[in-house]
């Protein structure tokens, strides 16, 4: 939308409405004249919106941005309908004017000033939806009938293959665990039997050493003691 002094973009202030969240919308004002143009922004609901700046000056052949912020709302209007409106007033200012020079009297028609006014609507739009996740069973090669069932419960067809696969994996893991336990048990039993046999031989050597007249310890006795210690350490480490 445009008037004789300024171009206004956009013509409607659109806010992607979300509860409990501040939302901003930019309004661009373009001066298409060789004059300094003062502007003022009003709203029908000043407690709901914050406008920065709400007054200002647009230099000749240049543009300015106005940021309109809607305060966080606790409730959503029915069907996202909004009746709020904004009014943009603009008037030719003196050369070299600054925002500090803008006064309320400049926009008074009673004082004989030529004031241009443009009404802007507020439009609420739904926020963009997140992308939908890819449904299971939609890969190439799957049967078209798998997506629709007679009673409308399409999820029944996609959940069954996943459950079966998980159950097979669990069974495989359980079989491997049982096999490992069996193997370790057999190794432990073999080690225990070997330990018992060595213990018997050690007892026999002890009896023979007692009958020996010499007080020295036979070399075989020392060797067996060391071997038993190694075997016991191996068993304790494996179990």
From Swiss-Prot:
Biased composition (Polar residues): 140-156
Pfam families recorded: Motile_Sperm
Chain positions with Phosphoserine modification: 132, 164
Localization annotation: Endoplasmic reticulum membrane
UniProt modified residues of type N-acetylmethionine: 1
GO BP term (any one): protein targeting
Any one of the GO CC terms: cytosol
Superkingdom per UniProt: Eukaryota
Name the UniProt record assigns to this protein: Vesicle-associated protein 1-2
Organism this protein belongs to: Arabidopsis thaliana (Mouse-ear cress)
